[in-house]
Structure formats: structure tokens, C-alpha cells
Amino acid sequence: MINNLSISSSLIPDKQRGSVESQVFYLTNRVLRLTQHLQLHGRDYSSQRGLWKILSKRKQLLVYLSKRDKLRYDDLIGQLGIRGLKTR
């Protein structure tokens, strides 16, 4: 029922477990699991609220990474298969 990302956590070395990329990876994995849960339980409003919190945290990390290092940001977006940030 719950599938993990096609990108394994072995791509993230042990030294970089707290890096922005690894945090975005784990948050994306949680988003996918919660999305599948909410497809089965559409009225679970506390899970919806948790999903919004996770999405906002992931967005903050992606904004930080895009300002800090655009190449790492583009590589991460490509690996995870998620949409990039909207530019103003």
C-alpha cells in the first residue's frame, strides 16, 4: 500500500543526514505516505493539517536551498520528481 520513493536513502551518506537535501527527502517521503492515507480517509482533518505543516516546512527548506545553491536545488528537484518553486 505505501510505497517509498524510488530514490533510496543510501544516496545520502551518513555524514549528511542533517543536510537540507536529506531533510527534503524525508519530508517528501512523509508527504507521499500522508497523501496515500488521505486518499483512503478523506475526512481525517488532523492528518490534513499535518500534511500542510510538512509541505510548508519542505517549501521553506527548498527556498533556502534555491537561494543558497541553485545547482544542488535543481539536482534535488530532478531526483525527487517534485515541482520547483514558483518564481515571482
Curated annotation (Swiss-Prot):
Its main location: plastid. Pfam families: Ribosomal_S15 (PF00312). Part of the 30S ribosomal subunit. This is Small ribosomal subunit protein uS15c. PROSITE patterns: RIBOSOMAL_S15. Transmembrane segments: none annotated. One of its GO terms (molecular function) is structural constituent of ribosome. One of its GO terms (biological process) is translation. InterPro entries: Ribosomal_uS15 (IPR000589), Ribosomal_uS15_bac-type (IPR005290), uS15_NS1_RNA-bd_sf (IPR009068). NCBIfam families: S15_bact. It is found in: Plastid, Chloroplast. One of its GO terms (cellular component) is ribonucleoprotein complex. It comes from the Eukaryota. Keywords: Chloroplast, Plastid, Ribonucleoprotein, Ribosomal protein. Belongs to the universal ribosomal protein uS15 family. CDD domains: S15_NS1_EPRS_RNA-bind.
